Amino acid sequence: MTTSVPPKLTVVWFKRDLRLQDHEPLHHAVSVATDKGYPVLPLYLFEPDIMADPHHSERHWRFVWQSLLAMQRTLQAAGGELHVSYDNAVAFFRRLIAAHPHIEVVSYAETGLHCTFERDKQLSALFNRHDINWREFPYAGVQRGITHRRTWHQRWQQLMAQPALSTDLHHPHWYVNKSMVNRVPGDIAARLHQPDDSKQPGGEHHAHKLLASFLTDRHTHYHRNISSPLASFNSCSRLSPYLAWGNISLRQVYQALNSAG
């Protein structure tokens, strides 16, 4: 008697790459899903240990929250669901593995803090014990493990010259199971959901809108106003938070800048 093996579940773990286009791990997962019929689980974890790190503040997590809401709207329109869980990563993946032993995890390689480095070491050990493949894609041209910089510039230029990835999100292989997630505590969710008009809003759409306005007209007096705390507010790109949290890719900005001349 032949026992059927359930299809492998591909987990796309979003961290500081909160966008749905020019996203290599997501593009890979969707391509595999289309080719082999594997379901795809988009995932973001609000990790209490990471949130408590002094490098972060509530304004960072509010930006993340807004970015996730924008992603959720787009995914739901395509029949998918972004699974957002309030969990330490090891605890979540232990629970997921117990329910779905056949998984693959794809993400960007995070260049972050000591706490994320330690988290990644624990996760690698967990995945190795369960013979789970965790594929980490290089992020923003960062080249890990190289012993010299002689070819760094050439490789970076090659990466930036590659076409930005456009992913068709309308396919039938999204995995949706909200029972796997722990809801963000109500008091935290309420604070993060509270708008703050004095801060830049998170989201892929806002990043591209800001880039377009900079390339169209705001750049005109950049060289004059860069040193002025008041004037630089409008003359600078103001893309820092969008690049930091991955609402837009470095390649998208680089190519848009080159196209604008």
Residue ranges and their predicted role:
Residues N88-A207:
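Beta-rich, aromatic/charged-enriched effector core domains that present basic-aromatic interfaces
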Residues M1-G79:
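N-terminal beta-strand-loop-alpha-helix module at the start
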Residues Q162-G261:
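Catalytic cores of enzymes that engage adenine nucleotides and/or redox cofactors via long glycine-rich
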Residues D22-H28, F92, R119-Q122, A260:
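Short alpha-helical segments and helix-capping/turn motifs at coil-helix boundaries
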Residues Q76-E81, H130-I132:
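A short helix-to-beta-strand connector/capping loop
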Residues L20, I50-M51, L113-T116, Q143-I146, ...:
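Short catalytic/ligand-binding loop motif for oxyanion handling, primarily in non-cytosolic enzymes
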Residues G80-A89:
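Short beta->alpha junction loops
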